[in-house]
């Protein structure tokens, strides 16, 4: 896709129309006086510099390939994605291993992997640590296995297909890479990256007082925010953010997981000129948060006026760059999906919801990282849902969290989605909050994570066996998958489809 400042993202097929309009405008400019021609040239040079800068800062947001949003049909054969279309995974040994087998005419299937350990389970499947046979060096993956019969009987086949299609689109350092997917007579299988650091929920449990420091929480929240921003650029509403779904890679950086609840919709990303604001930091006092849902004063849209009469010089913009914004607001899902403690009010009230639910869950997420618990948890699930709807946001009396962190959480946990931070301007608005001051968004992958996982000793999982499993062993593996998928039910995980 082509990125044009001040305009929507446009495909190569339609970009020439905009170029034609630009050429017509330039022709008119040639009829003006020389002084205006010189001024126009200065403005064009400035614009080119800004385009170059924003392109650099947008590297983590949008891949340089077209996104195919069309639905894909099931393929009974193995499918692996060409790593040339995944720029951020260059030099990945997992791709080398997969492509090496593919170059020899091998179509990956379940028999090409040695199952080492069950890592966890979700609502529609279980995840296993697996080793790719015949790979040199030895290569490990996480394989999500979903039972076909169970998906059909529970009316969740579409969710499994949606997850696979979404994973096939993703190309981002904080999102999963789908190396291959295939199916057998009984199972759908997704082959992804194995994250040796576990998830943020388990890591939080190991921290003093079971909560992260503010610096650590800021680091993890920053990377999650970039992942959500990228998803929204693709027209994907995540809908399942919680620490359990934020995995920690072996380098300490994060990866979002589980996309079976995600919602896809159309989206129109745009570049909008921003102006540097000044004045107050927009801190809200606790009384205001209790009395109602207020939007922090630090967050007001900063739009570029399109009138030519009001053009400003370069100095007037104070070096600010265009903002890339994309909020898929043209969707109103009626699905009741998610985890009780993270459900947004509009989901519970069945009012229809869009991308703003991700910003609500982002607020709950930050609150839990800093306090070790979610803000609306009740004695039971019904009490929790009631608290989300009817109780104001409160912070613990002993809370040592800074006022800027509280202010961000208050803005995110506004019960009316239209008044919530980022409802119109998305992650761009959140990035400018004082809580994230000092974060270098373009270079965050180079930052030192607050926690580095211990190296995994895979030898304790590897069992001595032949390269080719006999039929009896294959049947044993199939039964193991059956039992694991049948037991994968989470009582705190609810999914009700109204339509």
Curated annotation (Swiss-Prot):
Its EC number is 2.7.11.1. PROSITE patterns: PROTEIN_KINASE_DOM, PROTEIN_KINASE_ST. Keywords: ATP-binding, Kinase, Nucleotide-binding, Serine/threonine-protein kinase, Transferase. ATP binds at residues 119-127, 144. Residues 1-92 are annotated as: Disordered. Interacts with PDPK1/PDK1. One of its GO terms (molecular function) is protein serine/threonine kinase activity. Autophosphorylated and phosphorylated by PDPK1/PDK1. Residues 63-85 have a biased composition (Low complexity). Specifically expressed in root hair cells. Residues 39-55 have a biased composition (Basic and acidic residues). The keyword Nucleus does not apply. Residues 113-436 form the Protein kinase domain. The gene is RHS3. Plants over-expressing RHS3 show altered root hair morphology, such as spiral, bent or branched hairs. One of its GO terms (biological process) is root hair cell development. Pfam families: Pkinase. This is Serine/threonine-protein kinase RHS3. SUPFAM superfamilies: Protein kinase-like (PK-like) (SSF56112).
């Amino acid at each position: 896709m082509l990125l044009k400042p001040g305009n929507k993202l446009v495909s190569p097929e339609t970009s020439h129309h905009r170029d034609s309009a630009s050429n017509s405008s330039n022709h008119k400019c040639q009829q003006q006086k020389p002084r205006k021609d010189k001024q126009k040239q200065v403005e064009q040079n400035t614009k080119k510099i800004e385009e170059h800068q924003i392109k650099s800062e947008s590297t983590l947001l949008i891949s340089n390939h077209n996104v195919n949003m069309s639905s894909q049909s099931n393929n009974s054969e193995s499918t692996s994605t060409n790593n040339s279309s995944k720029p951020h995974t260059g030099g990945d040994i997992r791709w080398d291993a997969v492509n090496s087998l593919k170059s020899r005419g091998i179509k990956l299937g379940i028999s090409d992997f040695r199952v080492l350990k069950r890592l966890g389970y979700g609502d529609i499947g279980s995840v296993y640590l697996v080793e790719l046979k015949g790979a040199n060096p030895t290569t490990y993956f996480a394989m999500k296995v979903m039972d076909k019969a169970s998906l059909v009987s529970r009316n969740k086949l579409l969710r499994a297909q949606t997850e696979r299609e979404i994973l096939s689109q993703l190309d981002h350092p904080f999102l999963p890479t789908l190396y291959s997917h295939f199916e057998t007579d009984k199972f759908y299988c997704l082959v992804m990256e194995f994250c040796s650091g576990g998830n943020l929920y388990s890591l939080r449990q190991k921290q003093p007082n079971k909560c992260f420091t503010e610096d650590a929480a800021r680091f993890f929240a920053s990377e999650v925010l970039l992942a959500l921003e990228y998803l929204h650029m693709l027209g994907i509403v995540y809908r399942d953010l919680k620490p359990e779904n934020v995995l920690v890679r072996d380098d300490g950086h994060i990866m979002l997981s589980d996309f079976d609840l995600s919602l896809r919709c159309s989206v129109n990303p745009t570049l909008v000129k921003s102006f540097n604001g000044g004045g107050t930091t927009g801190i809200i006092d606790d009384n205001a948060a209790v009395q109602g849902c207020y939007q922090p004063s630090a967050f007001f849209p900063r739009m570029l006026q399109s009138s030519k009469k009001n053009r400003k010089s370069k100095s007037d913009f104070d070096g600010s760059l265009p903002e890339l914004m994309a909020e898929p607001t043209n969707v109103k899902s009626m699905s009741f999906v998610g985890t009780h403690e993270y459900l947004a009010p509009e989901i519970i009230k069945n009012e229809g919801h869009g991308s703003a639910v991700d910003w609500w869950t982002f607020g709950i997420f930050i609150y839990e990282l800093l306090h070790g618990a979610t803000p609306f948890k009740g004695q039971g699930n019904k009490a929790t849902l009631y608290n989300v709807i009817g109780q104001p946001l409160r912070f613990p009396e002993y809370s040592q969290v800074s006022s800027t962190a509280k202010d961000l959480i208050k803005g995110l946990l506004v019960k009316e989605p239209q008044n919530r931070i980022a409802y119109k301007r998305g992650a761009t608005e959140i990035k400018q909050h004082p809580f994230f001051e000092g974060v270098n968004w373009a270079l965050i992958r180079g930052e030192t994570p607050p926690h580095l996982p211990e190296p995994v000793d895979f030898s304790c999982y590897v069992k001595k066996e032949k390269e080719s499993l006999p039929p009896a062993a294959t049947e044993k593996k199939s039964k193991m998958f059956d039992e694991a998928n049948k037991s994968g039910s989470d009582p705190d995980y609810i999914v009700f489809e109204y339509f």
